[in-house]
């Protein structure tokens, strides 16, 4: 990932970061809201009407980063219900989204749509998404990693790692896979990074710190949960860590 001089991690609140990169989240609000309705809620007994909940800021941030670097390709580890991939696919310059998960595409899971419990597969969710841009997305299962290494080597502009958060070896292997698939100017985005100043719940922070100590990267911690929605719960010292071979701001 390049040979730029190592920098101290810069920390930004979400709205501050959006101002720096000239991104207006409201222009994407209607579309991403529709995606979040289907893919971002958990069962809530008290919820009678959909609203953008705490943490729904993430897809805006991922899409904004894709826009910032003029990305044409996006690789994701940890599909979940596809929130990130569907949102990034809406970016005009994006031509390819590849998303990898340990759960088969056809396997039904207990989840929620608009806070209401439902058992549904990723394949069935995909059919509910109305945006034509979803055709850009290719879904892969973990057993297809050798295929990805062979046919997608150095193909991606962004790797978004949002898979296992607790097993250090799995996270390290996710980094290795991402580096294989990224081109020389590609950036990595780590979800659920917690700074050393916080009470870390996940292994992500320690693994990323070790990775940063070995390389010559620019890094940015962007705090986002509760920064647009449910602002009374605004989170600090945690968010996504963006690692880049060049300066983003």
Can you say where each PLM-predicted feature lies in the sequence?
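Compositionally biased, intrinsically disordered low-complexity segments
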Residues: 14-20, 24, 35-38, 243-246
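N-terminal auxiliary segments of SAM/dcSAM-dependent transferases
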Residues: 1-27
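S-adenosylmethionine/decaboxylated-SAM
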Residues: 48, 53, 59-249
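Class I SAM-dependent methyltransferase Rossmann-like catalytic core
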Residues: 23-69
């Amino acid at each position: 990932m390049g040979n730029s001089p190592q920098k101290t991690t810069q920390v930004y609140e979400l709205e501050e970061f959006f101002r720096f990169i000239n991104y207006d989240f409201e222009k994407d609000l209607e579309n991403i809201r529709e995606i979040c309705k289907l893919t971002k809620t958990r069962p809530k007994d008290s919820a009678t009407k959909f609203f953008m909940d705490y943490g729904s800021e993430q897809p805006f941030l991922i899409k904004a980063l894709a826009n910032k670097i003029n990305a044409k390709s996006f690789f994701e580890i940890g599909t979940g219900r596809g929130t990130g991939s569907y949102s990034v696919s809406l970016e005009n310059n994006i031509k390819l989204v590849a998303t990898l998960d340990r759960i088969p595409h056809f396997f039904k899971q207990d989840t929620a749509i608009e806070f209401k419990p439902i058992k549904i597969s990723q394949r069935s969710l995909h059919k509910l998404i109305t945006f034509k841009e979803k055709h850009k997305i290719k879904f892969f299962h973990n057993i297809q990693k050798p295929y990805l290494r062979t046919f997608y080597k150095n193909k991606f502009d962004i790797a978004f790692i949002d898979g296992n958060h607790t097993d250090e070896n799995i996270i390290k292997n996710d980094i290795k896979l991402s580096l294989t698939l990224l081109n020389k100017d590609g950036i990595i985005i780590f979800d659920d990074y917690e700074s050393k100043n916080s009470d870390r719940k996940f292994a992500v922070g320690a693994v990323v710190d070790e990775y940063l100590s070995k390389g010559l990267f620019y890094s940015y911690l962007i705090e986002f949960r509760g920064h647009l929605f449910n602002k009374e719960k605004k989170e600090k010292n945690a968010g996504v860590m963006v690692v880049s071979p060049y300066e983003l701001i």
